[in-house]
UniProtKB/Swiss-Prot annotation:
Constituent of COPII-coated endoplasmic reticulum-derived transport vesicles. Required for efficient transport of a subset of secretory proteins to the Golgi. The C-terminal Ile-Leu motif is required for exit from the endoplasmic reticulum. Facilitates retrograde transport from the Golgi to the endoplasmic reticulum. One of its GO terms (biological process) is protein transport. This is ER-derived vesicles protein ERV41. It is a multi-pass membrane protein. A motif (Isoleucine-leucine motif) lies at residues 349-350. It is found in: Endoplasmic reticulum membrane; Golgi apparatus membrane; Cytoplasmic vesicle, COPII-coated vesicle membrane. The keyword Cytoplasm does not apply. GO terms for cellular component: COPII-coated ER to Golgi transport vesicle; endoplasmic reticulum; endoplasmic reticulum membrane; ER to Golgi transport vesicle membrane; Golgi membrane; retrograde transporter complex, Golgi to ER. It comes from the Eukaryota.
Length: 352
C-alpha cells in the first residue's frame, strides 16, 4: 500500500528544477484578464441578445389600411372638403368619418415650421415601450367655452381655423388624401370664397396602420405657413413600408414612411389648372416589409461559442508569447527571455 501511495502515473518536474519567471507570470495574468473580459462580454450578449433587421417580401394580403391624422388648418370648417382618391379611381368623401372642431388657428410651441423631421428608424425597446394603442376623442363644441352673447367681444378669439382629427380606412393601393375647399376641384352645393381660404396648417399626427400616439413619425409636430400666399398648394409624397418589431414573444406591427414635400404658389398653378389650392398627401405602399427582431442564442450555442473563442485566444496567446520570446532572445540575448530568469545558483563565474 505504501508503494501505491507514492506511485504517480504522471510524474511532474520537481520544484528544485523549476525556474519561475516574473515576466512570464505577468503575461499569463494579462491573458487571463483578457479572457475574463471576453467571457463577460459574451455573457452580456447572451442575456441581452442582438438586433436583427431583415427585408422580406410582404406576404400579408391587406385590403385596407388606416390613416390617422390630427391637423390644424387655417380655414373654417364650413369651407373644408376632404376626399380620398386612389388609383382605382375610387373617390371617398371622408368628412363624415373625421372629427372637425372650430378653433382659433395657432402654431404650437416646439413645432418645426416649413420643415419636416429627420427620418430615423426607432430603437426596438423604444417602440415596444411606446406602442400603446389609442383612439381619438370625441368632437367638442369649442364655442361653448366662450360666451358669445357678451357685449364686450374683444376678449373672444377668432375662430379662423379647423381642427381635423380621426382615423379613416382606405384601400391599400396608391392614392391621395385631399384637404381642399368646397367647389375647388369637385362640384359642391356651396362655394367657398377664396378670400377666406388659407391652407397654412399644423400636423400634430400623421401615420398609417394602428394608431400609436407615442411613436414619432416624420410629419408629426410640423407646420407649413406662408403669410404672403395663403392659397399655396402643399403636396406630401409618402412611401410607406410595413415594419414588424419582435421581442420575447411581443410583436408590434407598424408602418414607417419616408416623405418629400413640395409647395406650389396659386399664381403659378392657376393658369395651368392642373393643381388646386389645398393640402395633399400622396401615399404609395412598398412591396417589401422590414422585420426588426431581438435574437438570442440557445445555451448550448452560447457554451460552444464561448469555449471556441476562449480556446482560440489561448492558442493565439501561446504563439504570440513563443514568437516574442524567440525575438527577444535573438535580438537582446537569453537574459531577456520571457520564459525564465536565471538565479545566482545558475549563473556562471563570469556572469556574477
Amino acid at each position: 500500500m505504501a508503494g501505491l501511495k507514492t506511485f504517480d502515473a504522471f510524474p511532474k518536474t520537481e520544484e528544485q528544477y523549476k525556474k519561475k519567471s516574473t515576466k512570464g507570470g505577468l503575461t499569463s495574468l494579462l491573458t487571463y484578464l483578457f479572457l475574463l473580459f471576453i467571457a463577460w462580454t459574451e455573457f452580456g450578449e447572451y442575456f441581452g441578445g442582438y438586433i436583427d433587421q431583415q427585408y422580406v417580401v410582404d406576404s400579408q394580403v391587406r385590403d385596407t389600411v388606416q390613416i390617422n391624422m390630427d391637423i390644424y388648418v387655417n380655414t373654417k370648417c364650413d369651407w373644408l372638403q376632404i376626399n380620398v382618391r386612389d388609383q382605382t379611381m375610387d373617390r371617398k368623401l371622408v368628412l363624415e368619418e373625421l372629427q372637425l372642431e372650430e378653433m382659433p388657428f395657432f402654431i404650437p410651441y416646439d413645432t418645426k415650421v416649413n420643415d419636416i423631421n429627420e427620418i430615423i428608424t426607432p430603437e426596438l425597446d423604444e417602440i415596444l415601450g411606446e406602442a400603446i394603442p389609442a383612439e381619438f376623442r370625441e368632437k367638442l363644441d369649442t364655442r361653448s367655452f366662450f360666451d358669445e352673447s357678451d357685449p364686450n367681444k374683444a376678449h373672444l378669439p377668432e375662430f379662423n381655423g379647423c381642427h381635423v382629427f380621426g382615423s379613416i380606412p382606405v384601400n391599400r393601393v396608391s392614392g391621395e388624401l385631399q384637404i381642399t375647399a368646397k367647389s375647388l376641384g369637385y362640384v359642391a352645393s356651396r362655394k367657398a370664397p377664396l378670400e377666406e381660404l388659407k391652407f397654412n396648417h399644423v400636423i400634430n399626427e400623421f401615420s398609417f396602420g394602428d394608431f400609436y400616439p407615442y411613436i414619432d413619425n416624420p410629419l408629426d409636430n410640423t407646420a407649413q405657413f406662408n403669410q404672403d400666399e395663403p392659397l399655396t398648394t402643399y403636396v406630401y409624397y409618402t412611401s410607406v413600408v410595413p415594419t414588424l418589431f419582435k421581442k420575447l414573444g411581443a410583436e408590434v406591427d407598424t408602418n414607417q414612411y419616408s416623405v418629400n414635400d413640395y409647395r406650389y404658389l396659386y399664381k403659378d398653378v392657376a393658369a395651368k389648372g392642373d393643381k388646386m389650392p389645398g393640402i395633399f398627401f400622396k401615399y404609395n405602399f412598398e412591396p417589401l416589409s422590414i422585420v426588426v427582431s431581438d435574437v438570442r442564442l440557445s445555451f448550448i450555442q452560447f457554451l460552444v461559442r464561448l469555449v471556441a473563442i476562449c480556446s482560440f485566444l489561448v492558442y493565439c496567446a501561446s504563439w504570440i508569447f513563443t514568437l516574442l520570446d524567440m525575438a527577444l532572445i535573438t535580438i537582446m540575448g537569453p537574459k531577456w527571455s520571457l520564459r525564465y530568469q536565471p538565479d545566482d545558483k545558475t549563473k556562471g563565474i563570469l556572469d556574477r
